[in-house]
């Protein structure tokens, strides 16, 4: 039996931690942040979400979010040359799951966050825009939370799988 070792093991640890950190951030939004924002008057909820969206693309979070994707893809290249070993299947599953998280982020969340940035929180259509944003954004966030955390779990399993 062969366990993942050497540089691929280091990459797997990085991928597991990165996916877990990203999933944890998304979990916070799903578990309580969006619910709390939804309880605020629309103008306050919009303003708070706009402020978070401006702060989110910090270097540290971008490294965790997209760096994990890059590491996962590189790690999958290694896994593809070891398909006879069980850890490789878990690495490929972890990568696929995490990439779903990234795709949902880029294709769904970023455009909606950009559109929300253009909404005047005190404008006449603000309450309607917020109502259209809040629930679907949260539902799709559940998906990226689940896929990021499931990806992290798959990477962790790969570390101990022979």
Put a short name on every predicted segment.
Residues 5-20, 77-100:
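Interfacial segments of alpha-helical transmembrane regions
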Residues 9-10, 21-66, 111-135:
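Interfacial loop at the N-terminal end of multi-pass membrane proteins
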Residues 11, 18-21, 26, 71, ...:
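Hydrophobic residues within membrane-embedded alpha-helical segments of Major Facilitator Superfamily
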Residues 13, 92, 135-138, 142-145:
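Internal alpha-helical transmembrane segments of multi-pass membrane proteins, especially GPCRs
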Residues 64-75, 144-152:
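Core segments of transmembrane alpha-helices
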Residues 99-107:
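Mid-bilayer segments of alpha-helical transmembrane spans in multi-pass integral membrane proteins
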Residues 157-162:
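Juxtamembrane boundary at the C-terminal end of a transmembrane helix
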């Amino acid at each position: 039996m062969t366990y993942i070792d050497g540089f691929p093991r280091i990459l797997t640890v990085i991928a597991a931690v990165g996916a877990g950190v990203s999933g944890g951030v998304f979990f916070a939004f799903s578990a309580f942040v969006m619910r709390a924002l939804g309880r605020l008057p629309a103008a306050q909820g919009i303003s708070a979400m706009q402020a978070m969206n401006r702060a989110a693309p910090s270097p540290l979070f971008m490294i965790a979010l997209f760096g994990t994707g890059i590491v996962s893809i590189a790690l999958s290249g290694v896994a593809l040359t070891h398909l006879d070993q069980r850890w490789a299947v878990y690495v490929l599953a972890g990568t696929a799951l995490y990439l779903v998280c990234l795709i949902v982020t880029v294709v769904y969340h970023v455009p909606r966050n950009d559109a929300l940035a253009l909404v005047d929180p005190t404008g006449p259509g603000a309450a309607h825009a917020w109502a259209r944003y809040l629930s679907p954004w949260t539902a799709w966030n559940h998906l990226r939370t689940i896929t990021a955390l499931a990806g992290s779990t798959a990477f962790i399993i790969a570390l101990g799988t022979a």
